[in-house]
Swiss-Prot record:
Function: Endonuclease that catalyzes the cleavage of RNA on the 3' side of pyrimidine nucleotides. Acts on single-stranded and double-stranded RNA.
Active-site residues, record numbering mapped to chain: 12 (proton acceptor), 119 (proton donor)
Binding residue positions for substrate: 7, 10, 41-45, 66, 85
Protein name, UniProt field: Ribonuclease pancreatic
Major localization listed first in the record, in broad terms: secreted
UniProt lineage: Eukaryota, Metazoa, Chordata, Craniata, Vertebrata
GO cellular component: extracellular region
Matches recorded under PANTHER family: RIBONUCLEASE (PTHR11437), RIBONUCLEASE PANCREATIC (PTHR11437:SF24)
Keywords: Disulfide bond, Endonuclease, Glycoprotein, Hydrolase, Lyase, Nuclease, Secreted
SUPFAM superfamilies assigned: RNase A-like
Glycosylation-annotated residues: 34
Organism of derivation: Aepyceros melampus (Impala)
Enzyme class name: lyase
Similarity remark: Belongs to the pancreatic ribonuclease family.
Length: 124
Protein backbone atom coordinates (compact mmCIF):
# COMPACT_ATOMS: atom_id res chain seq x y z
CA UNK A 1 0.00 0.00 0.00
CA UNK A 2 1.17 3.50 -0.81
CA UNK A 3 2.47 5.31 2.30
CA UNK A 4 1.09 8.72 3.26
CA UNK A 5 4.48 10.28 2.50
CA UNK A 6 4.65 8.63 -0.93
CA UNK A 7 1.08 9.71 -1.65
CA UNK A 8 2.02 13.32 -0.80
CA UNK A 9 4.91 13.13 -3.27
CA UNK A 10 2.71 11.68 -6.01
CA UNK A 11 -0.06 14.20 -5.47
CA UNK A 12 1.93 17.35 -4.77
CA UNK A 13 5.60 17.23 -5.79
CA UNK A 14 6.91 18.28 -9.19
CA UNK A 15 10.58 19.09 -8.69
CA UNK A 16 11.38 18.47 -12.36
CA UNK A 17 9.98 21.83 -13.48
CA UNK A 18 10.34 25.30 -11.96
CA UNK A 19 6.79 26.22 -12.95
CA UNK A 20 3.83 25.00 -14.98
CA UNK A 21 5.03 24.50 -18.54
CA UNK A 22 1.73 25.43 -20.22
CA UNK A 23 -1.96 26.09 -19.65
CA UNK A 24 -2.41 22.36 -20.26
CA UNK A 25 -0.10 21.46 -17.34
CA UNK A 26 -2.87 20.53 -14.89
CA UNK A 27 -4.79 18.40 -17.39
CA UNK A 28 -1.63 16.38 -18.08
CA UNK A 29 -0.36 16.17 -14.49
CA UNK A 30 -3.66 15.33 -12.82
CA UNK A 31 -4.02 12.42 -15.24
CA UNK A 32 -0.42 11.16 -15.10
CA UNK A 33 -0.39 11.25 -11.27
CA UNK A 34 -3.63 9.20 -11.12
CA UNK A 35 -5.68 12.01 -9.55
CA UNK A 36 -8.55 11.47 -11.99
CA UNK A 37 -8.84 7.67 -11.77
CA UNK A 38 -12.12 7.18 -9.94
CA UNK A 39 -13.31 10.80 -9.97
CA UNK A 40 -12.04 14.26 -10.86
CA UNK A 41 -10.15 15.57 -7.81
CA UNK A 42 -11.62 19.11 -7.61
CA UNK A 43 -8.54 21.02 -6.43
CA UNK A 44 -4.86 20.09 -6.22
CA UNK A 45 -1.57 21.92 -5.77
CA UNK A 46 1.81 20.95 -7.22
CA UNK A 47 5.01 22.30 -5.64
CA UNK A 48 7.98 23.07 -7.91
CA UNK A 49 10.74 22.84 -5.31
CA UNK A 50 13.13 20.12 -4.22
CA UNK A 51 11.72 17.37 -2.03
CA UNK A 52 14.31 18.27 0.63
CA UNK A 53 13.07 21.88 0.71
CA UNK A 54 9.46 20.78 1.07
CA UNK A 55 10.31 18.19 3.75
CA UNK A 56 12.20 20.92 5.64
CA UNK A 57 8.92 22.80 6.10
CA UNK A 58 8.08 20.23 8.80
CA UNK A 59 10.60 22.00 11.06
CA UNK A 60 9.48 25.53 10.19
CA UNK A 61 6.53 27.63 11.47
CA UNK A 62 4.01 25.51 13.41
CA UNK A 63 0.43 26.55 12.60
CA UNK A 64 -3.03 25.07 13.07
CA UNK A 65 -4.41 23.00 10.19
CA UNK A 66 -7.77 23.86 8.61
CA UNK A 67 -9.32 20.91 10.45
CA UNK A 68 -8.02 22.12 13.82
CA UNK A 69 -5.13 19.66 14.13
CA UNK A 70 -1.86 21.15 15.33
CA UNK A 71 0.64 19.30 13.13
CA UNK A 72 0.70 21.81 10.26
CA UNK A 73 3.73 23.87 9.27
CA UNK A 74 4.08 26.97 7.12
CA UNK A 75 7.15 27.51 4.96
CA UNK A 76 9.34 30.48 5.92
CA UNK A 77 9.90 31.33 2.27
CA UNK A 78 7.59 31.45 -0.72
CA UNK A 79 7.65 28.50 -3.09
CA UNK A 80 6.81 28.07 -6.75
CA UNK A 81 3.45 26.28 -6.92
CA UNK A 82 0.77 25.47 -9.46
CA UNK A 83 -2.88 25.35 -8.46
CA UNK A 84 -5.11 23.03 -10.46
CA UNK A 85 -8.83 23.72 -10.20
CA UNK A 86 -11.57 21.80 -11.95
CA UNK A 87 -13.40 23.86 -14.58
CA UNK A 88 -17.17 24.15 -14.83
CA UNK A 89 -17.20 22.07 -18.00
CA UNK A 90 -15.19 19.23 -16.44
CA UNK A 91 -17.01 15.92 -16.39
CA UNK A 92 -15.56 12.57 -15.31
CA UNK A 93 -13.81 10.77 -17.01
CA UNK A 94 -12.89 13.86 -19.07
CA UNK A 95 -11.58 15.90 -16.17
CA UNK A 96 -10.59 19.44 -17.12
CA UNK A 97 -8.51 21.86 -15.05
CA UNK A 98 -7.49 25.50 -14.96
CA UNK A 99 -3.76 25.98 -14.36
CA UNK A 100 -2.70 28.86 -12.09
CA UNK A 101 0.95 29.58 -11.37
CA UNK A 102 1.88 31.31 -8.08
CA UNK A 103 4.64 31.97 -5.56
CA UNK A 104 3.25 31.43 -2.07
CA UNK A 105 4.03 30.03 1.35
CA UNK A 106 2.84 26.44 1.66
CA UNK A 107 1.20 24.85 4.68
CA UNK A 108 1.62 21.09 5.06
CA UNK A 109 0.67 18.56 7.72
CA UNK A 110 3.55 16.38 8.90
CA UNK A 111 3.74 13.06 10.73
CA UNK A 112 5.81 9.94 11.16
CA UNK A 113 9.45 9.16 11.81
CA UNK A 114 11.14 10.67 9.84
CA UNK A 115 8.75 13.62 10.25
CA UNK A 116 7.61 14.34 6.69
CA UNK A 117 4.70 16.01 4.85
CA UNK A 118 1.64 13.78 4.46
CA UNK A 119 -1.02 16.37 3.53
CA UNK A 120 -1.09 19.66 1.64
CA UNK A 121 -3.28 21.98 3.72
CA UNK A 122 -3.11 25.41 2.07
CA UNK A 123 -1.01 28.10 0.42
CA UNK A 124 -0.86 31.69 1.70
Amino acid sequence: KESAAAKFERQHMDSSTSSASSSNYCNQMMKSRNLTQSRCKPVNTFVHESLADVQAVCSQKNVACKNGQTNCYQSYSTMSITDCRETGSSKYPNCAYKTTQAKKHIIVACEGNPYVPVHFDASV
